[in-house]
Regions:
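A conserved regulatory-domain signal marking ACT and ACT-like small-molecule sensing domains
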Residues: 1-84
């Protein structure tokens, strides 16, 4: 398993990916270019170069088109929106 501390918020994005340099920046750039503001970013990984989970709190609901763009980024395995 992957250890992580995170507070759940109203609007979140759940991402799993391979641990590769620059991927967090690509995620941030993708979200920013779509007008999505990151409120909080939580990351956990099992080992260097291994599996990663991100829980990203955003200010507003995310359109499915944004999720589609995230899934096109190399090394991203899974993307889901979470609304509480």
């Amino acid at each position: 398993g992957i250890d992580m501390e995170a507070k759940f918020a109203k609007h979140m994005i759940y991402i799993t990916n391979n641990d590769t340099p620059g991927l967090v920046g690509k995620i941030g750039h993708c979200l920013g270019s779509q007008g999505v503001n990151i409120a909080n970013f939580n990351l956990g990984r099992d080992k260097i170069g291994g599996n990663v989970i991100e829980l990203i709190e955003v200010d507003s609901p995310v359109d499915d088109s944004v999720l589609d763009k995230l899934t096109q980024i190399e090394d991203i395995v899974q993307v889901k929106k979470l609304n509480f």
